[in-house]
Regions:
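Non-catalytic signal-transmission and effector/linker regions of two-component phosphorelay proteins
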Residues: 1-7
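Conserved phosphotransfer cores of two-component systems
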Residues: 44-47, 69-76
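The short loop immediately C-terminal to the conserved phospho-acceptor aspartate in CheY-like receiver
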Residues: 56-57
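Short acidic/polar segment at the start of the alpha1 helix of CheY-like receiver
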Residues: 12-16
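Acidic, metal-coordinating helix/loop segments flanking the phosphotransfer/catalytic sites
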Residues: 32-51
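Charged docking surfaces used in two-component/phosphorelay signaling
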Residues: 17-25
Length: 81
């Protein structure tokens, strides 16, 4: 079995790096998105995402909009920050 894949979504690159570094040390495969639109695109391209860590306040598409879009198609766990 491969590593669990986690999508980290935050418009602040420092926060993304902090979370990514922590998760990679725990042996997770980490994908990053800098805004909501990018997050939705990545989610639908990568079918095996096990968890999404999602910032609420972002440009283009906020976290609530991203959550609604993904929830319409998937029950993947989402942690809102």
């Amino acid at each position: 079995m491969g590593k669990l894949k986690i999508l980290v979504v935050d418009d602040e690159s420092r926060m993304r790096k902090l979370v990514k570094d922590f998760l990679m040390k725990k042996d997770f495969d980490v994908l990053e998105a800098g805004d909501g639109e990018q997050a939705v695109d990545i989610f639908f391209e990568e079918k095996d995402i096990a968890l999404i860590i999602l910032d609420v306040m972002m440009p283009k598409m906020d976290g609530w909009q991203v959550c609604r879009e993904i929830r319409a198609h998937s029950r993947v766990p989402i942690i809102m920050l």
